[in-house]
Design a protein with these regions (language model features):
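A short, polar/proline- and glycine-enriched secondary-structure boundary/capping micro-motif
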Residues: 71-75, 119-120
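N-terminal signal-anchor transmembrane alpha helix of single-pass membrane proteins
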Residues: 1-18
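Metal-dependent nuclease catalytic regions and adjoining charged, substrate-binding loops involved
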Residues: 32-46, 89-140
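Metal-dependent nuclease catalytic cores in nucleic-acid-processing enzymes
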Residues: 75-97
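A generic structural signal for short coil/turn motifs at secondary-structure boundaries
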Residues: 69-73, 108-110
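Short hydrophobic/aromatic-rich motifs at helix boundaries and adjacent loops
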Residues: 6-8, 21-23, 54-57, 95
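Conserved catalytic cores of phosphodiester-cleaving nucleases, focusing on short active-site segments
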Residues: 45-70, 79-85
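Active-site metal-binding core of divalent-cation-utilizing nuclease and nuclease-like domains
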Residues: 24-56, 75
Length: 140
C-alpha cells in the first residue's frame, strides 16, 4: 500500500530545507494536511509518522518535534521505532533507519533487531498493564 504525497515541488523544497528531510520521494506526509493512519493488523498498531521518504536503501520514517534537545528522548525513539515497524509491515518494505528532527538538529536512529525487539516487548508490557486495569505487576 502506497500513500502518495500531494505536495507541489516548491512546497517540497521548503519542507526539506525547514526540517532537513533527506532526498528521496516523499510517499507519505501528515504534517501539511491530515493523512490516513497506517495500520498493522499483524502488530495491532496504528500511527501517523510526519513523513515517509523512499530512498534507495529503503523507506525512512521522519518524525518532527518542536523542542530542541542534545540527545533524543527515549520515548521519541520508541515512537519512531513504532513508525518503522508500521512502515515495514504496511509497505512490506525495508526500513534501515528513521529520523527524528528537533529544531535545527536531526538524529538518524538505526532500526535494528534490538530496537524492534525492545519495541515489541514495550508494547506487550503496555497491553498487559491495560488488561490488568492499569496496575503494574510486582516483580519478585
Amino acid at each position: 500500500m502506497f500513500i502518495k504525497a500531494s505536495l507541489d515541488k516548491s512546497k517540497v523544497v521548503k519542507i526539506r530545507k525547514k526540517y532537513g528531510i533527506p532526498k528521496g520521494n516523499i510517499t507519505y506526509t501528515d504534517l501539511d494536511k491530515p493523512a490516513k493512519p497506517l495500520f498493522s493488523a499483524k502488530h495491532k498498531l496504528v500511527g501517523k509518522p510526519d513523513y515517509i521518504v523512499k530512498r534507495k536503501e529503503g523507506h525512512i520514517p521522519v518524525e518532527v518535534k518542536s523542542s530542541s534537545v542534545e540527545i533524543p528522548y527515549k520515548s521519541h525513539i520508541m515512537q519512531l521505532a513504532a513508525y518503522c515497524l508500521l512502515v515495514e509491515d504496511v509497505y512490506n518494505a525495508k526500513v534501515p533507519y528513521g529520523i527524528i528532527v528537533y529544531g535545527d538538529r536531526q538524529f538518524k536512529i538505526p532500526y535494528s533487531n534490538i530496537l524492534k525487539t525492545r519495541l515489541i516487548i514495550t508494547i506487550d508490557e503496555m497491553r498487559n498493564c491495560l488488561r490488568t486495569n492499569g496496575r503494574l505487576k510486582e516483580k519478585a
